[in-house]
Amino acid sequence: MKFAGIIAEYDPFHNGHAWQLAQAKALGAERVAVAMSCSLVQRGALPLLPEAVRTRSALTCGADLVFALPAPCACAGAEAFARAGVALLAAAGCDGLVFGAETPDAALLMEAAELLDSGSYRAALKAQLAGGARSFAAARQAAAAQLASDERVAALLDKPNNNLAVEYCRAIRSLAPRMEAYPLPRQGANHGEALHSAHGQFASASALRKLWAEGGADAVAPYVPEAVFPLYQEAYAAGQYTDFSAAGRCELALLRSACRDKAPFADIRGVSEGLEHRLEAAVRTSTTYDELLDALTTVRYPRARMRRLAMDAALGFTADSLPALPPYLHLLGGKKDALPFLKNCTLPVSHSLARLRGSGDASARMAEAQLAASDFGTLCRVSPEAMGGLLRQKNIFLT
């Protein structure tokens, strides 16, 4: 592996992320490119910190190039998220993908990916769903258990990072067959797990967001690289972090405004089985964002999926308006001596989103959606900013 790729959110960047970057170099990579969620993250929310802070954090701790994973691609289910990230990094020229997994066995993950791509699996999954499976995740695991010759294949699908890892492997098989998979064991706390002394200096991003909400930047200091902590202190002092209470109210306001139209959510991506009606009814009766999610969430419709649906609806992300894969490479920052690696990119590449917006119809549609997400996010910070900030944002070059 010469040019490693990592798909990340860095929400926020912490010691586990720095360890992963170091491991990519230890595996032999000369350079590491990151496809980083821009303006939105996969759970259907705004990131805690701005792109500039997260980009500089990654570059300070070992990344060589950081590209924006466009907001519509970042705010997506595991399959679409993985496909977008792999496609972006393949277009950048990466020959290896480094990612975390509870089961860091590349051969086993690829075996699971091959199974999930098979026609027999799709038929078994359809039968499980038709048979009244409690959830998609349960149906997925049951279908895999029914067909897998190795019981470990179905068992690994019971873990969240393994599920995303398998989707990365499926995307590699489909979009970048020459790319190698390099799974790494997850360090410290799992997603959503409470902090414990046994985890040492490692904490999950969700735990760090909770710590930040309770005690500000100082509270996360033990779990982030020393070189990154001053960036967090500056962001906190300047109010450049998300006010999630304000974000929820702003999102609900956008959804209420949309309800003035007839069938307001019929064309929103991800809508099926009458979800557009369920969403409209929930919007009309909810007075808080949490009430909205409570009204939408069921065993069949997990909260994360409903958060993504609500965000898509608030920002007007329709099914037929957005490319499924990134049509360009938006460079957020890089090391100056890594810039020659950009010469082999197979998509338009620039640090200027305005320039990329003019590179074709698909690029224009993706860039407009990205700007909508960015403008929503900057309004929802503790110290809000004016529209168009992403167009004015200076590239970050480190020596």
Residue ranges and their predicted role:
Residues M1-R54:
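N-terminal catalytic cores of NTP/NDP-binding nucleotidyl/phosphoryl-transfer enzymes
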Residues I7-A8, V41-Q42, A58, P72-C73, ...:
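Short, contiguous strand/loop micro-motifs
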Residues K25, L59, V86-A90:
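Non-catalytic positions within long, well-ordered alpha-helices that form the structural scaffold/packing
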Residues A26-A29, R56-T60, R140-Q141, E180-A181:
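Short hydrophobic/aromatic-rich motifs at helix boundaries and adjacent loops
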Residues R31-V32, L65, M179:
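Secondary-structure boundary/capping positions in well-ordered alpha/beta enzyme cores
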Residues T55-P70:
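A glycine-rich helix N-cap at a beta->alpha junction
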Residues A68-T399:
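Active-site cores that bind ATP or allylic diphosphates and position pyrophosphate for catalysis
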